Amino acid sequence: MESGKMASPKSMPKDAQMMAQILKDMGITEYEPRVINQMLEFAFRYVTTILDDAKIYSSHAKKPTVDADDVRLAIQCRADQSFTSPPPRDFLLDIARQRNQTPLPLIKPYSGPRLPPDRYCLTAPNYRLKSLQKKAPTPAGRITVPRLSVGSVSSRPSTPTLGTPTPQAMSVSTKVGTPMSLTGQRFTVQMPASQSPAVKASIPATPAVQNVLINPSLIGSKNILITTNMVSQNTANESANALKRKREEEDDDDDDDDDDYDNL
């Protein structure tokens, strides 16, 4: 520590000499050399803040200049904000006595650190795991069949219509393509029956194929081509021939009835 006389030579600025004199008047004779610089910086910052606040108060009061009342108000507000005095000792003792009268929670006798419950400790987890949302099951009366797309060939299911079921010809052909891994998967192709205008209800029809199950393990790395035809040409020709024969039989029966009527 250096004395104040050694820290304030004649070469010091006037502000530094004044700060050294203030310290000497307060009975501070020993201090470090940089204490004067810190005190000067604090005084400059404090005075600048007070004058800025006084200018704001003066403009708010619509005064042409800053007067002493504005400076006093700024000093009072700054003192209440920055230089708050601690509460008295007796007041702190009363608060501490009331706080200590509250009993601490009981510690459960178990192995581990002897700490109060988690809600009284800062070590309790402050997060909660989010539960996974389960998807709603599909209703039993409604089955959604996705669009089948294997390679470059696709088959889109259509909505089934009410009517007389008609036979459908289905051909499944395979062609070599890019290898695919289809192990453990199973595809369902739904082909609903539709009514054909060329066939009447009096002709018995073969039940149509509704579902075709394809096991990829039997196919391997091949593409699947599924094509459906409404009614084959042979079935249409047979139906037309049956109708023609029925009409001829009806015409023959009519001719026989006419001959019998003439004979009578």
Curated annotation (Swiss-Prot):
GO cellular component: MLL1 complex; nucleus; pre-snoRNP complex; SAGA complex; transcription factor TFIID complex; transcription factor TFTC complex
Pfam families xrefs: TFIID-31kDa (PF02291)
SUPFAM superfamilies: Histone-fold
Family: Belongs to the TAF9 family.
InterPro entries for the chain: Histone-fold, TFIID-31, TFIID_subunit_9
Modified-residue entries (Phosphoserine), positions: S149, S152, S155, S158, S181, S196
Keyword field contains Isomerase: no
UniProt feature, compositional bias: Polar residues: 151-174
Subunit structure: Component of the TFIID basal transcription factor complex, composed of TATA-box-binding protein TBP, and a number of TBP-associated factors (TAFs), including TAF1, TAF2, TAF3, TAF4, TAF5, TAF6, TAF7, TAF8, TAF9, TAF10, TAF11, TAF12 and TAF13. Component of the TATA-binding protein-free TAF complex (TFTC), the PCAF histone acetylase complex and the STAGA transcription coactivator-HAT complex. The PCAF complex consists at least of TADA2L/ADA2, SUPT3H/SPT3, TADA3L/ADA3, TAF5L/PAF65-beta, TAF6L/PAF65-alpha, TAF10/TAFII30, TAF12/TAFII20, TAF9/TAFII31 and TRRAP.
KW DNA repair (keyword) present: no
Biased composition (Acidic residues): 249-264
Free-text function comment from the UniProt entry: The TFIID basal transcription factor complex plays a major role in the initiation of RNA polymerase II (Pol II)-dependent transcription. TFIID recognizes and binds promoters with or without a TATA box via its subunit TBP, a TATA-box-binding protein, and promotes assembly of the pre-initiation complex (PIC). The TFIID complex consists of TBP and TBP-associated factors (TAFs), including TAF1, TAF2, TAF3, TAF4, TAF5, TAF6, TAF7, TAF8, TAF9, TAF10, TAF11, TAF12 and TAF13.
Subcellular location: Nucleus
UniProt gene name: Taf9
Gene Ontology biological process terms from the UniProt entry: box C/D snoRNP assembly; chromatin remodeling; mRNA transcription by RNA polymerase II; negative regulation of apoptotic process; negative regulation of proteasomal ubiquitin-dependent protein catabolic process; positive regulation of response to cytokine stimulus; positive regulation of transcription by RNA polymerase II; positive regulation of transcription initiation by RNA polymerase II
Annotated organism of origin: Rattus norvegicus (Rat)
The protein's name in its UniProt record: Transcription initiation factor TFIID subunit 9
GO molecular function, one term: transcription cis-regulatory region binding
Residues found modified as Phosphothreonine: T159, T161, T164, T178
Source superkingdom: Eukaryota
List of residues that carry N6-acetyllysine: K5
Classification via CDD domains: HFD_TAF9 (cd07979)
